[in-house]
């Protein structure tokens, strides 16, 4: 009878150990289940958030055909938009009359390729659309420093020498199209106010080269509506034409032509010019990018003469 209590105590210890072990296993299972539940919930939230808030970049290109009439003749323009490379290609004409216009919004260049000429013309364009903000101070319209020129008062003239270094187009769609042809920079040339008035009043046609005329006809839909230019400012401009331009060549200063080609300053201008153009922008960031929403937005920038910047650095203005 005296040996029974120790045996009962050993049984109690065994039962307590088994109960503690089972409780420990249940607690571990609960912790593991809670961790897996939190991980699953986190993955679901991340998947839902990435699907709804992360913009999905489409991998396909978008094609569109536009029909219009020019001089009584029906013509077609094919537009191709590649959202991945941010390029926009316009094709028009057939055979030797075919023209390709490539807008590279990633690198900030526009290339125009004429199949008949076997030449490519390059010009710069904006890469990032600037934020629009109301000016803090009102601009005096009679200010003598700036004049506004719109797209219809500008013609693009090719440079005399072709482009030798093409490294700036290394990752551009323009180089794929214009790789085996001669490439030229084209620079904007302003049409004087008298020429615009003669064109409007007398109806005389400006004598553009055949290729430039085709390019102007193809871009008629992007031109800013005509505006009236003040005649008083033209009278002052006529008197300034008689004065020589101080380009500081006597002091050993020579301006790089790239400053003019890239739009940093104007070498042969007598005063600052405000250049306005329409810019197509995405609507709330949706693809395809870019496309023209409600005709685009007019953005203006002031290009000052290069000698004005030199005078400013010398403290003369």
From Swiss-Prot:
Residues 1-30 are cytoplasmic. GO terms for biological process: endothelial cell morphogenesis; negative regulation of angiogenesis; negative regulation of endothelial cell proliferation. InterPro entries: BRICHOS_dom, Chondromodulin/Tenomodulin. Residues 93-186 form the BRICHOS domain. Keywords: Cytoplasm, Disulfide bond, Glycoprotein, Membrane, Nucleus, Phosphoprotein, Signal-anchor, Transmembrane, Transmembrane helix. The keyword Oxidoreductase does not apply. The chain crosses the membrane at residues 31-50. This is Tenomodulin. It comes from Homo sapiens (Human). The lineage of its organism: Eukaryota, Metazoa, Chordata, Craniata, Vertebrata. The gene is TNMD.
